[in-house]
Curated annotation (Swiss-Prot):
InterPro entries: GAF-like_dom_sf, HrcA, HrcA_C, WH-like_DNA-bd_sf, WH_DNA-bd_sf. The keyword Transcription regulation applies. The gene is hrcA. It comes from Prochlorococcus marinus (strain MIT 9313). This is Heat-inducible transcription repressor HrcA. Keywords: Repressor, Stress response, Transcription, Transcription regulation. Negative regulator of class I heat shock genes (grpE-dnaK-dnaJ and groELS operons). Prevents heat-shock induction of these operons. PANTHER family: HEAT-INDUCIBLE TRANSCRIPTION REPRESSOR HRCA.
Length: 352
């Protein structure tokens, strides 16, 4: 599946799916939760007898087996081999995270105390990010990533064009209440198109509502001025993009040691992403939100075998940064969510 076809809407900022929870019988909820916990702990498919014995389920093995079959029909469990037990599917993990996640427990409180006792008040931001990333990896056993605070990228709200001889002054009005000025050479052939191209941009921005221009709908008679304007806006946008070096990550070796990443075919795209675009772990458009991406929910195909748990932190006057954990879909989600939230809150207290 190509990346541009992947789901772009963050799946995790919505309220828990109450309808799905109510439609899943209590027995199946209990069995799904137990199956997830067993698989996270053991990396082994599980059968009904083991679930009854280990988790003290008040039901016979036959009843639990029936519930597991129903969960498999719903797509929440899967059976890797005919003779094997069952494991959670990506959809099963999603339902678990949305509806069945337990409290994080005492481990998260231990991390809070540990962070409070760290002497980081006067540390430089780079040192602060590195130390907290290492602590996060040591605590969870997952790869951690922390990005520098950055203001949300402004969106385009209006385009104004002013001709001055053979030059064209382009004023870009952005959502940050700032205006950028671009000075371009104006071909003589395009001088009569300015009023029409400005009107076209105005209509486009009103239609899309998100600061984007659909250049594929540009009338053919405006191609000359449109090409000039498109290139100028693109160059300006690229210049505003934060550098990828504004992210630090730690614990790649922990991630690669997981059985899910024993195949080089699944490993190479992930290594390339972390080498060239580590900040892409946090999907564009989710900067102010916190939550969980599971498998193919993430817009980057390199992370389709992973889960990403993230939490934002705010820095006074600097914008928004991110704390994230990357691991296999088989992870302790309650602990991971509590851990990124603790580190994000600690960063806010230190930076504000």
């Amino acid at each position: 599946m190509t990346e541009h076809k992947r789901r772009a809407t963050p799946p995790y900022h919505q309220d828990p799916d109450v309808t799905a929870l109510e439609s899943l019988p209590a027995r199946q909820q209990q069995v799904l939760q137990a199956t997830v916990h067993h698989y996270v702990d053991t990396i082994e498919p599980v059968g009904s007898k083991t679930l009854v014995q280990r988790f003290g389920l008040k039901a016979s093995a036959a009843t639990v087996r029936s519930a597991m079959g129903a969960l498999e029909q719903r797509g929440l469990l899967t059976q890797p081999h005919t003779s094997a037990g069952r494991v959670p599917s990506p959809q099963g993990y999603r339902h678990y995270v949305d509806c069945l996640l337990p409290p994080p427990g005492s481990a998260a409180q231990h991390l809070e105390r540990e962070l409070t006792n760290l002497s980081l008040r006067w540390a430089a931001l780079d040192d602060l990010m590195w130390q907290l990333a290492r602590r996060l990896t040591d605590f969870t056993g997952l790869m951690s990533l922390i990005t520098r605070p950055a203001r949300p990228k402004p969106t385009l709200q209006a385009v104004r064009l002013v001709r001055s001889g053979d030059r064209l002054l382009v004023m870009l009005v952005e959502s940050s209440n700032q205006a950028s000025h671009l000075n371009l050479r104006l071909p003589h052939e395009a001088s009569n198109e300015l009023e029409a191209i400005e009107e076209w941009t105005r209509d486009q921005l009103a239609t899309t509502g998100n600061g984007s221009l659909d250049w594929s709908s540009l009338p053919p008679q405006l191609n000359l001025s449109g090409s000039l304007l498109r290139e100028a806006i693109h160059s300006h946008s690229q210049a505003q993009t934060p550098a990828e070096s504004d992210a630090v990550f730690h614990g790649m070796s922990r991630l690669l040691a997981q059985p899910e990443f024993s195949s080089s075919a699944s490993l190479q795209p992930l290594l390339e992403l972390m080498d060239t675009q580590p900040a892409a772990v946090v999907p564009v458009g989710s900067e102010q939100l916190g939550g969980v991406w599971i498998g193919a929910e993430h817009p980057k195909s390199a992370l389709e075998a992973c889960s990403v748990v993230q939490a934002p932190y705010h820095s006074s006057g600097e914008g928004i940064g991110q704390v994230a954990l990357v691991g296999p879909m088989r992870m302790a989600y309650a602990t991971a969510k509590a851990a990124v939230s603790s580190v994000a809150n600690h960063l806010e207290r230190l930076l504000c």
